[in-house]
């Protein structure tokens, strides 16, 4: 059985609307391509107290959680510090992170044709990006070598921290999936089967939904209302989703009951998750 996957997107710029989040859709895509699914997503500003609480909850779970943003070295970057507080450990300069940061410093100096001085004040400050919670491991960054980090939570969780830049975060998340999660790929194929019930009201469909879930406990029933559609008008997409071997029986009961009750049914939709 695969674990639950979660996402924490950090940054005041997301909540204020200065930047639009691109991570949610991409993480859903990366997981879906591997037969996995996102269970939840949290959005948190650069508020140390709220961020610490969010990460404590993630750490206490048994989930795999990706956290994007706030791991830089400016005063508004609070994710590294909040992660350490959430885990009850101190921050410490990770030796591999130090080496990678200095490698990046040397690369930039070489590109500019300048001497490399690791003791210069700004270069010493850059080492703060390698201050990770004690016990953390390196998360490689193929874009510019400045690493993220991964931590184990007391509940058995795995927390993976990346920069907020999509060009860095997405390949880092993909690296975690390929190197840490491959044994869960396509382990439990999921599907959904639904139908558009035209002119229906959710209240009238609720008893049927409850009955299907009682009869098929491994399957979830869903309803998605649309108020006005240019072709189908007001309707409800009613369906079942779950393991591929469990959905057909639940679907047959659902559609038979709809036909028996005289519901006006439109197109059916089948989707592999």
Please provide the spans of the model-predicted regions.
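An accessory alpha-helical subdomain
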Residues: 153-253, 257
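Structural motif
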Residues: 6, 63-64, 130, 136-137, ...
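N-terminal small/polar loop signature for handling phosphorylated ligands or for N-terminal nucleophile
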Residues: 25-86, 92, 103-106
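Conserved short beta-strand edge segments in small beta-sheet-based binding/regulatory domains
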Residues: 221, 257-273
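Glycine-rich phosphate/diphosphate-binding loop of Rossmann-like nucleotide-binding domains
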Residues: 1-41, 46, 248-249
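Glycine-rich beta-strand-to-loop/alpha-helix junction loops that act as flexible
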Residues: 10-12, 67-75, 163-164, 224, ...
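Proline/glycine-rich low-complexity loops and linkers
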Residues: 50, 78-163, 167-184
């Amino acid at each position: 059985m695969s674990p639950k996957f979660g996402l924490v997107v950090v940054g005041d710029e997301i909540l204020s609307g200065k930047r639009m989040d691109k991570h949610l859709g991409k993480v859903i895509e990366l997981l879906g391509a591997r037969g996995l699914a996102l269970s939840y997503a949290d959005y948190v500003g650069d508020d140390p107290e709220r961020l610490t609480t969010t990460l404590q909850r993630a750490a206490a779970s048994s989930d795999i959680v990706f956290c994007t943003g706030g791991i830089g070295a400016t005063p508004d970057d609070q994710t590294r510090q909040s992660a350490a507080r959430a885990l009850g450990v101190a921050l410490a300069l990770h030796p591999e992170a130090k080496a990678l940061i200095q490698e990046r410093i040397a690369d930039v100096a070489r590109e500019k044709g300048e001497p490399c001085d690791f003791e210069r004040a700004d270069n010493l400050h850059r080492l703060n990006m390698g201050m990770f919670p004690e016990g953390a491991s390196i998360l490689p960054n193929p874009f510019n070598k400045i690493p993220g980090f991964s931590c184990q939570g007391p509940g058995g969780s795995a927390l993976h921290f990346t920069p907020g830049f999509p060009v860095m975060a997405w390949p880092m998340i993909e690296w975690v999936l390929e190197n840490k999660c491959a044994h869960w790929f396509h382990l439990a194929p999921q599907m959904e089967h639904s139908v558009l019930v035209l002119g229906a009201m959710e209240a009238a469909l609720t008893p049927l939904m409850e009955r299907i879930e009682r009869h098929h406990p491994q399957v979830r029933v869903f309803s998605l209302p649309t108020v006005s559609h240019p072709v189908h008008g007001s309707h409800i997409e009613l369906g079942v989703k779950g393991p591929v071997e469990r959905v057909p029986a639940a679907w047959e009961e659902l559609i038979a009951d709809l036909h028996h009750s005289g519901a006006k049914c439109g197109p059916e939709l089948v989707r592999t998750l």
